[in-house]
Amino acid sequence: MPLLHMIGITSSGLTFSIGFCFLPGETQQDFAWGFRCFQEYSISPKVIIIDGDQAQKNAIEEVFPNTPTLLCIWHVNQCVLSNCKALVGQEDWESFQAAWRTVIQARTALEFDDNWGKFQAKYANPKTQQCVTYLQKEWLKLGQKERLVKA
């Protein structure tokens, strides 16, 4: 059974458990039920950080329509690992990860665009182009790149 764990973060960066519940599955309905359980206790988050799961995102929009969602970079990086490491190859993986980190850790839009352009140029070869396309379609699509956060 999946566990829905709501965590809060203090202004000093400390985390604490707000609550948790077991879900019958991982569908939009399951997540919506879990979020409504929290809502019954007047838990109204200012922002929700998710792993990118569409069912979760849809449930948040249903239950907490005015709450913005952000993407957890750790989970994004796990997806990048599972989708790109075999294509990039073990010998180039560390370099690929370092270049990807410079993209996602950019502090300004200008720095991001510059780093992304360098990344695309460096990995515009038959071996890694599929990874570049994956990153662009899955994680850097319009409006998505601004939602990547370290949590």
What are these regions (language model features)?
Residues 2-14, 23:
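Short conserved beta-strand segments at catalytic cores or DNA/RNA-binding microdomains
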Residues 13-17, 75:
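Short Cys/His-based metal-binding microdomains
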